[in-house]
From Swiss-Prot:
GO terms for cellular component: intermediate filament cytoskeleton; mitochondrion. Belongs to the short-chain dehydrogenases/reductases (SDR) family. 17-beta-HSD 3 subfamily. The keyword Acetylation applies. The modification N-acetylalanine is found at residue 2. Interacts with STYXL1. Keywords: Acetylation, Mitochondrion, NADP. This is Inactive hydroxysteroid dehydrogenase-like protein 1. InterPro entries: 17-beta-HSD3-like (IPR052149), NAD(P)-bd_dom_sf (IPR036291), SDR_fam (IPR002347). PANTHER family: INACTIVE HYDROXYSTEROID DEHYDROGENASE-LIKE PROTEIN 1. The keyword Endoplasmic reticulum does not apply.
């Protein structure tokens, strides 16, 4: 009995001496909970402010805000084509750049007939490197280029381990994903600075958030575009230029990997047209955005999750996409 009493007294003494530490831990816990709660509330507010409120008001006058002409690279498919149509619906004349002349002419005719704007097509294969930029520079000379959309991109045929990626694909990723955006900005930026207005939108990818296995070179090239755009914004915001890094996740376009389960989830992977409508509404508002509300939710999860969990999920998804692509080829 004496031993029990002694243990009880010892326990009370230890508990009394630890009270101050327990109170401190409680304060730390309360501070952490409050901080996370405020972060979640701010993220939710940002989501609503960026993706829903702008679409409730009148459409902005993009011509007055930026200029009369828009240049879109990669304009024959997917996001690029849809973005060109959305800008044309705002009354901007559009210059479409791609390597497929027949599809370019068809897209230009459709836009001109539908939206009653001027169109110009430039046939350019960005994978050929430096030689293609002189004709582009000459064609854009003395035009009021208000918006540049860098959407042209090279992708793996399907997710692959790096050693299995063809060497030509790696060169395409360097020339098309990295060099094309850099050189196109270099061509149009001086005119924008002279006019003290303009917008540059560079399409990155959700895979740039963290290292993405089975898309190693592609995700690294998109990380370059993200950092490039953010740095340009710091350099040229004071000169009236708005630079946006656009970070989409999956969109149901022909250029993306064939993922039928994503096609069955339009809220998760919207069509290019729906995506472009939302993305254009963020122009002039957000310097770095996914462009679509459900993609912003995915981006928040990606930002908060540990890297090992991202890698695990990426491996799981990309294995599934590779398996589906290979089964389609069989």
């Amino acid at each position: 009995m004496a031993a029990v009493d002694s243990f009880y007294l010892l326990y009370r003494e230890i508990a009394r001496s630890c009270n101050c530490y327990m109170e401190a831990l409680a304060l730390v816990g309360a501070w952490y909970t409050a901080r996370k709660s405020i972060t979640v509330i701010c993220d939710f507010y940002s989501l609503v402010r960026l993706h829903f409120i702008p679409r409730l008001g009148s459409r902005p006058d993009l011509i007055k805000q930026y200029g009369r002409w828009a240049v879109i690279s990669g304009a024959t498919d997917g996001i690029g084509k849809a973005y060109a149509e959305e800008l044309a619906s705002h009354g901007l004349n559009v210059i479409l750049i791609s390597q497929e002349e027949e599809k370019l002419q068809a897209a230009a005719k459709h836009i001109a007939d539908t939206y009653r704007v001027e169109t110009l097509v430039l046939v350019a294969d960005f994978s050929r490197g430096r030689e293609i930029y002189a004709p582009i520079r000459e064609a854009l000379r003395d035009r009021d280029i208000g918006i540049l959309v860098n959407d042209v991109g090279a992708f793996y045929p399907y997710p692959q381990y790096f050693s299995q990626v063809p060497e030509d694909t790696l060169w395409d990723i360097v020339n098309v994903n990295i060099a094309a955006a850099s050189l196109m900005v270099h061509i149009v930026l001086p005119g924008m600075v002279e006019r003290k207005k303009g917008a540059i939108v560079t399409v990155s990818s959700g895979s740039c958030c963290k290292p993405t296995p089975q898309l190693a070179a592609f995700s690294a090239s998109k990380a370059y575009l993200d950092h490039f755009s953010r740095a340009l914004q710091y350099e040229y915001a004071s000169k009236g230029i708005f630079v946006q890094s656009l970070i989409p996740f999956y969109v149901t376009s022909s250029g993306a990997a064939p993922a039928s389960f994503l096609h069955r989830c339009p809220w998760l992977a919207p069509s290019p047209r729906v995506y472009a409508q939302h993305a254009v509404s963020t122009l002039g508002i957000s310097k770095r955005t996914t462009g679509y509300w459900s993609h912003s939710i995915q981006f928040l999860f990606a930002q908060y999750m540990p890297e090992w969990l991202w890698v695990w999920g990426a491996n799981l998804l990309n294995r599934s996409l590779r398996k589906e692509a290979l089964s389609c080829q069989a």
